Amino acid sequence: MNKVIDTADQAVASINDGATIMMGGFGLSGIPENLVAALHRRGTRELTIVSNNAGVDGFGIGLLLTSRQVRKMISTYVGENKEFERQFLQKEIEVELVPQGTLAERMRAGGAGIAAFYTPTGVGTLIAEGKETREFEG
């Protein structure tokens, strides 16, 4: 099976509405511009985007936010995108804020086939509200 794909449009052809996509980038560096542009052209909607940030207005993930293609954002920082802020305040987008280290560990664990892990990060904060807590050896 040939795993080489010639274009970004071909690469996203099988990404359907409602998909969860993890995107790289840190601030404005490392943004997967070709992936974002191809998803934008395809018009894939109801996406859950996992990234450490929500991009900026009209660029990167911000392009998908402006075209209302993102249903949920799982991120560690979302502070520079006015369209994200507007959608969040109007309750038009679901948001899961996660500490940076916890998000990285979730990615690592998922890639390794580990279904769950425990971390003390966030215990006793707003992030922990509504989530299971356990005490070990304590």
Please provide the spans of the model-predicted regions.
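Conserved alpha/beta enzyme-core scaffold
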Residues: 1-138
